[in-house]
């Protein structure tokens, strides 16, 4: 009996897992918990009970389990007998004084735990790196040569492995590794290769490379110390570096590839499920295995390419116009994230359609076109835009905005907030420096304006959260959440105005109420001419005081949101209010005339918000 192998876990694998778990815990969703707990629990069940026949029947009835099987393989009965075979035939050996002595199928308990901790660590690393990724935009109908090339590669590896095992000798261990891992890699590649090659390298190569390199180093220490060893005559004798056999290097590379490919396949199926509601009606919470199977067998020819391209356009717009919102949207999941992106893309497109018009008259015409669009969309009251609505948009709206309008989820959003948003645009067009027209006369006017341009968006976001949540939320709580969202939106708009006094002055707009200016013995022209100084700073602080007053009144309702929206909304709110806190401090970091929050401070704020 010994503790040397256990110390490998205590020194290297467990601390790594603890750090990853601590980093990802605030972002952990029900679906993430399901993936981890389900994989490890079911794997242990199979290992402890040794239900080889039952696991085979599960795979026959549930093909989607093969996706998970790639992650679980080292813990399933396809793996445990394989490990047992290696140990019984002394391909792998463990000196008697390095393990505690507990075994299953002659496999030391420490080795079984290693299978668990590797899956846990690599899975968490993948989840951390892929969290910001918006998976639906990586779906594609196209089938290229890459699929066949990958299939040939993995099939060739299987054949090479079979030949090596049948020949015995020095290629035995490498052959066993290849015939154990490559059939599942072939399967996972065949069903998800487009996703694998289309995703950013930070979602594919990086979560494979980092744990592989880490385990190569750990394995080197263990092999040098004799914690475990590979028997001569079953290995090639080639080392990647001193102390690391080539077979061990390939083994860890393939196991981490299995885990990551399996998780990518899961995300591929979830993206299909979330992106195509015409094939998969409204779903809430963790999807059933039967539903996942249906996504697996859906022909790519049935993908709605227009919907995919609409989401691609929406993401491109947000990355250009509001990267912070796009990144914040990564804390949401599934169809809720899709609809929030579609909603915000519409708001940005509508704003650009009005602001970028060549004249005030053209801007007013754009607002009327948007009103007509909303009237038609809500008159038809259907999920997918009709041919009539499409014809109106294509004939009246510039092409770059078509997708943003046609993908607005009007079917389950109220119309009034969108109408009010357009009224806010109307207010913006009333500013006229030449005639002395400045429409924000009183505090109440500013509240109304803030409610229209920001409170409406917050209200619509809350409607989407309540629509998509699997939780039952009482109607009185729903009303409170929506009303508080309106107030919070006004608070955020106050911060926005406080930040942009100089920027707005450059386009001859002054959103400070005329009543406030009169008390300070200023005119709008004074602000336009000199948008800084002690008096302006005093007015800025007055805006911020009112912003934080409304924020403090409304923030309690965030805790009453469903769990899917609580943390992400808190991050969005706190990140924006932090701009107000920076403005209150001396010497804010300025960028293009605006106060900005330093990057590390933004990270701390988001982390704190998620951990509340």
From Swiss-Prot:
Region of interest: Lycopene beta-cyclase: 1-268
Q: What CDD domains does the entry give?
A: Trans_IPPS_HH
Which molecular function term from Gene Ontology is one that the record holds? 15-cis-phytoene synthase activity
Kindly name one Pfam family recorded for this protein: SQS_PSY
- EC number(s) stated in the UniProt entry for this protein: 5.5.1.19, 2.5.1.32
Pathway, per Swiss-Prot/TrEMBL? Answer: Carotenoid biosynthesis; beta-carotene biosynthesis; Carotenoid biosynthesis; phytoene biosynthesis; all-trans-phytoene from geranylgeranyl diphosphate: step 1/1
Subcellular location(s) of the protein: Membrane
Q: Which residues form a coiled coil?
A: none
Q: Which UniProt keywords apply?
A: Carotenoid biosynthesis, Isomerase, Membrane, Multifunctional enzyme, Transferase, Transmembrane, Transmembrane helix
What are its GO cellular component terms?
membrane
Induction details: Induced by light.
Q: Where is the secretion signal located?
A: none
Transmembrane portions of the chain? 3-23, 31-51, 112-130, 148-168, 171-191, 203-223, 246-266
Catalyses which reaction(s): all-trans-lycopene = gamma-carotene; gamma-carotene = all-trans-beta-carotene; 2 (2E,6E,10E)-geranylgeranyl diphosphate = 15-cis-phytoene + 2 diphosphate
Its annotated function is as follows:
Bifunctional enzyme; part of the car gene cluster that mediates the biosynthesis of neurosporaxanthin, a carboxylic apocarotenoid acting as an essential protective pigments and leading to orange pigmentation. CarAR catalyzes the first step of the pathway by converting geranylgeranyl diphosphate to phytoene, as well as the later cyclization step that transforms the carB product lycopene into gamma-carotene. CarAR also converts part of gamma-carotene into beta-carotene. Neurosporaxanthin is synthesized from geranyl-geranyl pyrophosphate (GGPP) through several enzymatic activities.
* Matches recorded under NCBIfam families: CarR_dom_SF
Q: What is this protein called?
A: Bifunctional lycopene cyclase/phytoene synthase
Give the species.
Answer: Fusarium fujikuroi (Bakanae and foot rot disease fungus)
| Gene from which this protein is expressed | carRA
């Amino acid at each position: 009996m010994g503790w040397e192998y256990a110390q490998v876990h205590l020194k290297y694998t467990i601390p790594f897992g603890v750090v990853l778990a601590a980093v990802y815990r605030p972002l952990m969703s029900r679906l993430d918990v399901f993936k981890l707990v389900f994989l490890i629990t079911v794997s242990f069940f199979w290992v402890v009970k040794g239900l080889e026949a039952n696991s085979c029947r599960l795979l026959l009835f549930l093909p989607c389990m093969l996706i998970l099987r790639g992650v679980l393989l080292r813990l399933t009965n396809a793996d445990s007998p394989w490990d047992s075979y290696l140990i019984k035939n002394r391909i792998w050996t463990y000196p008697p004084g390095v393990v505690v002595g507990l075994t299953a199928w002659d496999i030391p308990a420490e080795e079984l735990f290693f299978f668990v901790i590797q899956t846990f660590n690599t899975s968490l690393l993948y989840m951390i790196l892929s969290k910001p990724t918006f998976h639906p935009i990586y779906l594609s109908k196209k089938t290229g040569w890459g699929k066949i090339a990958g299939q040939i590669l993995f099939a060739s590896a299987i054949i090479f492995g079979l030949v090596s095992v049948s020949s015995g000798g020095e290629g035995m261990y490498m052959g066993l590794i290849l015939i154990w891992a490559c059939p599942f890699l072939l399967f996972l590649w065949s069903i998800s290769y487009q996703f694998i090659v289309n995703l950013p390298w930070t979602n594919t190569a990086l979560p494979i490379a980092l744990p592989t390199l880490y385990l190569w180093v750990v394995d080197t220490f263990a092999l040098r110390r004799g914690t475990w060893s590979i028997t001569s005559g079953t290995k090639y004798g080639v080392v990647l570096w001193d102390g690391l056999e080539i077979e061990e290097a390939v083994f860890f590379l393939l196991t981490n590839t299995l885990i990551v490919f399996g998780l990518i396949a899961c995300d591929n199926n979830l993206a299909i499920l979330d992106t195509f509601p015409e094939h998969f009606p409204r779903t809430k919470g963790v999807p059933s295995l039967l539903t996942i199977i249906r996504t697996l067998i859906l022909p790519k020819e049935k993908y709605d390419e227009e919907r995919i391209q609409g989401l691609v356009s929406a993401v491109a717009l947000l990355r250009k116009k509001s990267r912070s919102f796009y990144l914040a949207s990564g804390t949401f999941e599934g169809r809720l994230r899709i609809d929030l992106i579609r909603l915000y893309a519409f708001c940005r497109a509508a704003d650009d359609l009005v602001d970028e018009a060549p004249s005030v008259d053209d801007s007013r015409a754009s607002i009327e076109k948007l009103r007509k669009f909303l009237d038609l969309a809500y008159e038809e009251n259907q999920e997918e835009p009709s041919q009539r609505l499409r014809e109106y948009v294509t004939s009246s709206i510039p092409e770059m905005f078509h997708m943003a309008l046609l993908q607005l989820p009007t079917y389950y959003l109220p119309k009034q907030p969108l109408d009010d948003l357009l009224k806010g645009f109307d207010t913006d067009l009333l500013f006229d420096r030449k005639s002395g027209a400045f429409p924000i006369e009183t505090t109440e006017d500013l509240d109304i304006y803030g409610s229209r341009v920001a409170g409406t968006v917050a209200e619509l976001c809350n409607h989407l959260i309540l629509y998509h949540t699997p939780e039952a939320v009482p109607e009185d709580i729903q009303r409170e959440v929506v009303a508080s969202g309106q107030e919070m939106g006004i608070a955020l708009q106050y911060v926005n105005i406080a930040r942009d006094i100089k920027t707005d002055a450059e386009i001859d707009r002054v959103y400070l109420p005329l009543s406030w200016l009169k008390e300070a013995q200023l005119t709008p022209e004074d602000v336009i001419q000199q948008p800084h100084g002690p008096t302006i700073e005093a007015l800025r602080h007055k805006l911020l005081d009112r912003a934080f007053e409304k924020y403090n009144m409304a923030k309690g309702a965030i805790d009453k949101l469903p769990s899917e929206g609580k943390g992400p909304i808190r991050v969005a709110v706190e990140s924006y209010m932090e701009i107000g806190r920076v403005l209150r401090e001396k010497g804010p970091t300025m960028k293009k005339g605006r106060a900005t929050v330093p990057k590390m401070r933004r990270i701390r704020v988001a982390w704190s918000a998620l951990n509340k």
